[in-house]
Amino acid sequence: MNNVTPLHHLYVHIPFCHRICPYCSFHKHTPGGTDITAFVDALLKEVEKQPLKPKTIFFGGGTPTMLSDTHLERLLRGLKERLDLGELVEFTVEANPRTVTPSKAAVMRGMGVTRVSLGIQAWDDATLKTLGRDHSPAEAEETWQVLRDAKFPSLNLDLMFSIPGQELETWRQNLEHSLSLKPDHISAYNLNYEEDTDFFRRLQKGEFRTDESRDTDFFHLAIDLLEANGFEHYEISNYANAGHRSLHNEAYWLGADYLGIGPGAFSTIKGRRWKNVPDTDRYIALTLSGGSTVTDVEELTIEHRRTERFGLELRTKRGLPLDLIALDQRRMLDTLRDQGLLDYNETFVWLTRTGKSLVDPIAVALMGEA
């Protein structure tokens, strides 16, 4: 064990939500019937299975702040007791409006959480209703103020755009209101229609429609407005003030190994990827009895890993290493640069403002796939 290199990135999946949003495909459910104490114990037992010396920890979900103050403190304290946190530089917890009280914020801050990502999604009632969110704009602002008062070093707002019925001017107002709150980071996601969601079924029925031109207009408005206000557009969906990039997500985008614990969580370690069983009660029973929660093990081929690097690293401001592009495909670089879609130097290839809205087809073109 002493010869094993410890992992530096830990993801903890907490699947509980007040209600199930119609666009979300992550493993999640309401907490009714789940033994939350046993769930926390299972997480703490699982985290001991791999050597860890985390530089980043990320609590995602679901809604991690659905845990009570007592359970959240038990989990955070348990991690501190079990892990060497001497190199920890970022500890993020996702939260939703109405789930953070001053006492819960104090628990998180006191236990070493450095960053909170608040899932606002929108600031207007009509869009929130379409998204099936269970908070009002006023409740979102109240939660934001609680987090500000707790003096977390870094706060993020999560927003979504290109939502059915959403107008471009409404999106502008959402962005401007977000800026007025002075967040350290903003994530702005184009709505995706994921399989096994209510939104996907409505898309299939023709109730919703996609429009790439509309998506681009919303995307470019976000870029222009956020950059004009000093934010660095460092990844397709992410904007940060200086010193406030998401280090955990950056590690993922750049291909670092990571351990995921909790039901439905993915891990990628030394070319192997697996998922935990996406059933919370079964996850608890297996973990506490000493059984294996691992399912869907996948050995990542060199080509698979190369494809992922194109898809992820091209999304970043730094761009894709030039040496990943086959020599016979590099003629495409000048063609795409002449079209105003990318630029490059002797080390990296990166997308322009126009190219960022076409990241997927550009990645395919550079990989040389049909």
Each model region followed by its residue ranges:
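Short, flexible hinge/linker loops that cap or flank conserved catalytic cores
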Residues: 2-4, 15
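C-terminal scaffold of the Radical SAM
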Residues: 4-7, 29-324
